[in-house]
A protein has these predicted regions:
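RNase H-like nuclease fold core
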Residues: 1-22, 66-74, 81-114, 118, ...
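Alpha-helix initiation and N-capping motif
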Residues: 29, 41-44, 128, 145, ...
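Catalytic cores of large soluble enzymes that bind and process phosphate-bearing ligands
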Residues: 31-39, 107-111, 123, 140
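Glycine-rich, N-terminal phosphate-binding loop and its surrounding beta-alpha-beta segment
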Residues: 50-78
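Short, charged amphipathic recognition helices of the HTH superfamily
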Residues: 123-136, 198
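N-terminal alpha-helical interaction blocks
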Residues: 1-58
Length: 207
């Protein structure tokens, strides 16, 4: 098996993939998945580099920033971890650095947009540890539970910020709602550090 990047011409990447088949269908499928993940990593690396600058000086907030050179950084993708050498900029007097690639690629923490979307979608239906297991068994990335939690918190904060400027048309109701029932109930939850605590739950139900 093997994956090779043949060429990059403009916005097109040409790859060559060799996959070994087996008398065991499961083995063949595992080989296919591994090769496709390797391909995904290599193409994603090219896609990220495509969004990077050529190293020329840039202007930000009225100040000129120059590159410190191409520095390596690992990014999490749906296909596995990818290390990209990208330009990092800084003002002549020092201070905070700036990476144009991460802004152009909409990197969240160190995650690509699709990986952040996949992880946050999975976490909506399970725990962070379940998401970690699912990623390891069915995809490729091996990420820590804490990273999954922090990534989803970052996605949620972005959504909250964007929600203020979003406009949408309320859906048309199939049946007119004449009244709404409001409920409030309490239960006890066991917290790791603080023992049992009462939690209140509210409900809204159309009648």
């Amino acid at each position: 098996m093997g994956v090779q990047r043949i060429s990059i011409e403009g916005t097109k990447v040409k790859m060559e993939v060799t996959i070994e088949l087996s008398r065991s269908m499961l083995t063949s499928e595992e080989n296919i998945k591994q090769s496709l993940n390797e391909t995904g990593c290599m193409v994603t690396e090219a896609a990220l580099k495509y969004l990077d600058t050529d190293g020329s000086a840039i202007e930000s907030a009225g100040a000129v920033m120059r590159t410190k050179g191409e520095q390596p950084k690992a990014y999490q993708t749906p296909y596995g971890e990818v290390v990209v050498h990208r330009h990092v900029y800084q003002r002549s007097g020092g201070g905070k650095t700036y990476c144009p690639l991460e802004r152009e690629a909409r990197i969240i923490m160190t995650s690509t947009p699709l990986f952040a979307k996949q992880v946050s979608s999975k976490l909506a239906y399970g725990s962070a540890r379940e998401v970690q297991r699912d990623l390891a068994e069915n995809h490729s990335p091996l990420v820590a539970v804490s990273y999954i939690q922090r990534l989803c918190e970052a996605v949620a904060s972005i959504i909250e910020t964007k929600e203020e400027s979003w406009n949408y048309v309320p859906p048309k109701m199939d049946v007119e709602i004449h009244s709404v029932a409001i409920g409030l109930d309490g239960t006890c939850m066991l917290l790791c550090d603080n023992g049992w605590r009462e939690a209140m739950v509210g409900t809204l139900a159309p009648l």
